[in-house]
Amino acid sequence: YSCPGHTPGEMIFIDSKTRYLFCADACNRNLLLMQSGDHTEGRYVSVEKAAKAMERIVSMKDQYDHVINSHHDYRGFGAPLADYVVDQALECMKKIVDGTAEIREIPDPLQLNATKTVAVYGDVFITYSKEGVYETR
């Protein structure tokens, strides 16, 4: 299934036998929404569009019991995401879109002595650009 968010072409897969949702980078506790580049270049996903994709994942909960993602977030190796992460990611995106998200500056582990701005809801942090909240009309 198409699930734009981390990247425009993000895909998720459900294994109906094991009832696992494999979401790659579409959902985790420290989610980066891909917002570099020009809107027309196909390298951009708004928070608004990512929230719609996340709503789809939530609406499919009757088809999966566990979520496996690509990036490790201090769980035991190979362990699924906590049950609440998908819901918290969606709620965080909704709060970004409606302007009520809790915003924090946190250390950026990818850059020396730098911080990044994130929206926080529960245990979920979402990195996004202020210019990238809404779909262009």
Model-inferred region functions:
Residues 2-4, 8-84:
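Metallo-beta-lactamase
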Residues 52-137:
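Accessory terminal helices/loops
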